[in-house]
């Protein structure tokens, strides 16, 4: 559109790509609310001040769509993939009482959660507005969420009627939050929703609130009392592709690139493609990249809502980086057909002990290594293997939580932080090979034939993750043989 305007066209001469029937000058009619939140990565920059200023500090962003501001805000909070399942009520509300007023007043990525906690503690709206300079309207909307939390906590599981569940869902509460507030498990809340028939509706982003027919399949899921779903039945078998979520240090457009090419390849094979993502900065979230696009958080609940609506013949979890891979096991347990690499094969590659056994069986050499769940176990490994050590959590891609430690003090610091990165899986420690050459080899194999796509040589020292480093193609240290 910008190109057409620049060469002299006027808005009334340009068609609206979304509807295909109205001109671009037609005033949009919006029946949804959009919330965007920046994604920060201060954990990658130790010692950097988290206070937000006019300097750009975000590394990515997320976007969510809902029928209400409250719903869109809570969906955006869980889209960030920073363990929050909404605006609090997820078991992460532990704040330093001595400096709490400063936490509320100071602009940081976490301040919105401190504001919600202040309302839980009974702070007046006016006091929060004075401290933060946030418009009272937004404080009132957060107050609505906090009031609903109190109601859910007071009613317990006995108070979870169909009406109250729907009311909570209209405010964006996830099953995890409702479970936390009522003392139940997430799967119990999900089962209760199924019994009551509390399910999200498929809605379309069409710029005209359904007044005109839309040519695009740009969707979001929302809970609306008494409204109709805009879901369309499939003409061909559908495949769901789970994309990567927000950009972060070590993971960016490369995984989105894989998802886009997967959509193209599947379309060429006669499938309808369904993309799920919450990152507005990507090609996968262009409305014309896939047959159907869902702007939804990449959590188990939200992904299952899409799958329940679309009923795909398969779901691809291996092209979107760590986030969809983390969902693979639960999706399989829920009976979802996984296409491509199966969850057990993913576990074989991610579980360091299982992978070491496989390497031993295949007589493939690898640096001395072991796993540890506690600092004492890590010290024992260090004594056996020796420093320096390359340490990283299990079940983590893209270099998150990876470090090189040269002594016991650094090891103790790492182990204290690693439990926050991956609390359910042990830390993997292996001998760090100094002055070694590191290569990235991309290959595709089917058990019979193997195709090597590229061999890249790292310019940085061995151990620097490929997402944080520069590479050279072709490799300059290898012979032609």
Give residue ranges: language-model regions:
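ATP-dependent carboxylate/acyl-activation modules
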Residues: 1-481
């Amino acid at each position: 559109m910008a190109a057409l305007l620049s060469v002299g066209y006027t808005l009334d001469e340009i068609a609206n790509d979304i509807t295909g029937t109205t001109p671009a000058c037609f005033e949009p009619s919006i029946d949804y609310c959009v919330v965007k939140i920046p994604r920060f990565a201060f954990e990658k920059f130790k010692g950097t001040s988290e206070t937000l200023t006019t300097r750009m500090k975000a590394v990515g962003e997320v976007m969510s769509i809902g029928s209400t501001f409250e719903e869109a805000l809570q969906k955006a909070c869980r889209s960030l993939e920073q363990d929050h399942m909404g605006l609090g009520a997820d078991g992460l509300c532990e704040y330093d009482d001595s400096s709490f007023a400063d936490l509320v007043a100071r602009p940081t990525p976490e301040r919105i959660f401190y504001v919600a906690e202040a309302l839980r503690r009974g702070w007046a709206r006016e006091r929060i507005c004075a401290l933060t300079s946030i418009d009272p309207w937004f404080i009132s909307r957060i107050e609505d969420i906090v009031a609903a939390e109190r109601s859910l906590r007071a009613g317990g599981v006995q108070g979870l009627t169909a009406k109250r569940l729907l009311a909570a869902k209209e405010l964006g509460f996830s099953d995890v939050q409702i479970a936390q507030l009522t003392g139940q498990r997430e799967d119990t809340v999900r089962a209760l929703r199924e019994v009551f028939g509390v399910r999200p509706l498929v809605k379309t982003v069409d710029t005209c609130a359904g007044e005109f027919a839309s040519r695009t399949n740009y969707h979001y899921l929302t809970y609306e009392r008494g409204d109709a779903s805009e879901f369309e039945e499939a003409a061909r078998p559908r495949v769901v592709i789970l994309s990567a979520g927000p950009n972060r240090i070590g993971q960016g457009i490369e995984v989105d690139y894989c998802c886009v090419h997967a959509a193209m390849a599947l379309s060429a094979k006669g499938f309808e493609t369904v993309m799920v993502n919450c990152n507005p900065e990507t090609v996968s979230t262009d409305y014309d990249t896939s047959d159907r696009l869902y702007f939804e958080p990449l959590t188990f609940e939200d992904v299952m809502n899409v799958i329940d609506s679309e009923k795909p013949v398969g779901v691809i979890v291996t092209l979107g980086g760590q986030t969809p891979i983390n969902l693979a096991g639960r999706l399989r347990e829920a009976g979802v057909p996984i296409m491509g690499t199966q969850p057990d094969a993913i576990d074989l590659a991610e579980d360091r002990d299982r992978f070491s056994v496989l390497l031993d069986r295949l007589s493939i050499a690898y640096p001395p290594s072991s796993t540890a769940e506690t600092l004492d176990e890590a010290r024992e490994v260090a004594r056996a293997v020796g420093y320096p050590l390359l340490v990283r959590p299990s079940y983590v891609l893209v270099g998150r939580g990876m470090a090189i430690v040269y002594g016991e003090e650094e090891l103790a610091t790492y182990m204290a932080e690693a439990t926050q990165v991956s609390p359910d899986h042990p830390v993997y420690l292996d001998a760090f090979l100094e002055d070694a050459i590191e290569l990235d080899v991309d290959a595709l194999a089917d058990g019979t034939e193997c195709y090597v796509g590229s061999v890249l040589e790292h310019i940085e020292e061995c151990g620097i993750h490929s997402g944080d480093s520069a590479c050279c193609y072709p490799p300059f240290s290898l012979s032609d043989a």
